[in-house]
């Protein structure tokens, strides 16, 4: 992620997101042609390499458009996409494995990688043509809207100037770093554990039909989405008073 972030400072978030999403989608789609364990390991490694920098890139992009008072709600809406993808991905995966197996000579799992990898490529191209690195470049905004966004961001930056002189050692001494790290670790561990192992657990529990496994798999993600919506409502309440810091 560090090289990706350094490159993003030079070329901007728009080109960075284009690079990440297109390469990410190409590798994900290419997984459909894997036939050996070594090919699988290489493709998974490349997927991680190309995926790195996506979340920092999105956060950096949003800081150009939203002041701190609104950033919490915007980031929460962005993160809401993860459980929603789980809700949609389970049934889609079950349908692809059941209904597309043998179509065009491809097995169901190959269609699954094709269906889930191609949208990333298309969305990456859309990001490049639709998004702008700076509000001043947004032709789809009126002059008044651009001026308002730029003013709000500048006022926020003036009220919260960046702190200099910090080192890696000082960051390691900050308790908030460990609290946030633990929070993100538990969040990602839950997401990956459910995403990777829940289908196998359901099959071992006696659910045979692949599509039914996909439907059952969406339940925990749906509950997670509801919880994040409730948290989002709390953020809307706390942001006016800015009482949400750790």
How would you describe each model-predicted region?
Residues 104-167:
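Central mid-sequence intracellular linker of multi-pass
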Residues 36-44, 179-180:
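Short hydrophobic/alpha-helical segments at membrane-entry points of transmembrane helices
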Residues 235-246:
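Single conserved hydrophobic/aromatic residue that forms the stacking wall/gate
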Residues 75-97, 119-120:
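Glycine-rich segments within core transmembrane alpha-helices of 12-TM secondary carriers
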Residues 1-37:
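Conserved MFS/SLC helix-loop-helix module at the cytosolic interface between two early adjacent transmembrane helices
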Residues 171-228:
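Extracytoplasmic gate region of multi-pass secondary transporters
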Residues 12, 33-39, 50, 67, ...:
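Helix-breaking motifs and short loop linkers at transmembrane-helix boundaries and internal kinks
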Residues 43-80:
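Cytoplasmic helix-loop-helix junction between adjacent transmembrane helices
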